[in-house]
């Protein structure tokens, strides 16, 4: 059955409108010499989304800017290119720019994630807060009436109970930044009952109690829930599940990175979903998209990161 999306605020495009209302936003891009990255940057400039500092090979960056994007429109936002001799140097310069408040958002360019994260986690100039860093993806799914937030599809391999609690806090902060004031969180498992042989069900139940006891705040957690029960009220009703979260989950907390990664890519490639994603838990939002992600996805991720500044 097709579900009509009646609220334009539940479109990723609306995040771009929200982001343009925020002042003094500067994005530092590490190793910016990539066509998809620069296409997203140029589109963001066209929409007056943010100022940009592009770190990387000056010649390669300017070649892409000047040859591939000759028709870029004038913007009231600034674009600066800073040369770096290596990926490592570009990552350090970009992270330092955010650490010193020269920039407010960090964006990954054509650089291995491990190289960028090494700078992000640097004890001298990095962006560590003591909290776990986690991947938070916001999906706009065709024929579905709400944003769907998935965590974690790209950072934490096999999180334990406390790490899952921190991942919920990170995802809930992102949810509030995009207008979901009191997000509903479903810890996902294969079944919706506790099975001592399935750690995901035990953790889901524990997280629910932690939420009820005030150890996880600013959201409502109920689990474990199977995916169908989390997103379909009809499926939950058929199984007799009475819950404030079942069928209405805003955040899907997956038990392991394999589950998150497969769900993430299935939504994009099979369901034709649109997505924006950030790394939360650092001193500033980090846009850490895959090098295979489209320019559109990178633009939505930028808008999501900007909306979540200081949240």
Q: Where do the language-model regions lie?
A:
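Anion-binding alpha/beta catalytic cores of soluble intermediary-metabolism enzymes, centered on
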Residues: 1-245, 250-254, 259-311
